[in-house]
Amino acid sequence: MAAPSYQLLVVDDSKRDTLLLERILQQASDATFTVTHMESAKAGLEELSAQAYDLVLLDYYLPDMDGLAFLEEKQQRGLTAPVIMLTAFGQERLPVAALQAGALDYFRKDQVNSSLLGKAIQQAIEKARLQESAAADAARLRELEETVARLQQQLKEQQKS
């Protein structure tokens, strides 16, 4: 069975950190990752609007907006790619804030390794796909319920005639 292949968008102003992430991802032997890099949040949002990605690896500290503002803007634009947030600095409340803002996971860059990141990416992508599938199923169920209600109403009207 072929290894899964994923399209990733890395939004990070540090080329060095991006190269390090790419090396870490290459070591994740159970998947293939194609990486596109954007150096600012605004460029990342524009790229995400123009191209479909399986996942976004997002640095928290960016020159034009922080990761939480990125997540808010992403949601306002209706962009659905899952996000894993990364930061070089640990802040006590940031992981909770990131998850509440819509990130599916959060890591400090100095704690990331190929096994951890590879698994986190695959799990985040799978979770996002399951959420999309559940939303589609819920929408289909609502449609069916509306159809049943309409048919019941038609049946009642026919029985009266």
Q: Can you name each region flagged by the protein language model?
A:
Residues 22, 37-55:
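Acidic, metal-coordinating helix/loop segments flanking the phosphotransfer/catalytic sites
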Residues 27, 46, 68-80, 97:
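Short amphipathic alpha-helix used as the core "switch/output" element in two-component signaling
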Residues 116-129:
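Receiver (REC) domain switch/output surface
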Residues 12, 59, 87:
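Active-site residues of response regulator receiver
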Residues 40, 66-69:
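Acidic catalytic/metal-coordinating carboxylates
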Residues 63, 91:
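The feature encodes the CheY-like receiver
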